[in-house]
């Protein structure tokens, strides 16, 4: 019974990791989902930074 529970939990964790990675939660698609307050999103450079500074050049 314990082995079954461990396997179920492992499958759920792996599935959650795949969903997170596929949805771009780590910034692959957009790095600005967490950019708030006195910050602005610089999509080309994939950074979030202060509104007081210009966006850096785009990443290659």
UniProtKB/Swiss-Prot annotation:
Cystine pairings recorded for this chain: 32-42, 35-48, 41-55
Domain observations: The cysteine framework is VI/VII (C-C-CC-C-C).
Keywords from the UniProt entry: Disulfide bond, Knottin, Neurotoxin, Secreted, Signal, Toxin
Major subcellular location class: secreted
Upper lineage: Eukaryota, Metazoa, Spiralia, Lophotrochozoa, Mollusca
Family label: Belongs to the conotoxin O1 superfamily.
MF-aspect GO terms: toxin activity
Highest taxon in the source lineage: Eukaryota
Protein name, as recorded: Conotoxin Cal6.20
Natural source organism: Californiconus californicus (California cone)
Protein purpose: Probable neurotoxin.
Signal sequence bounds: 1-22
Keyword Disulfide bond in annotation: yes
Subcellular location: Secreted
Gene Ontology annotations for the cellular component aspect, listed alphabetically: extracellular region
Organ and tissue specificity: Expressed by the venom duct.
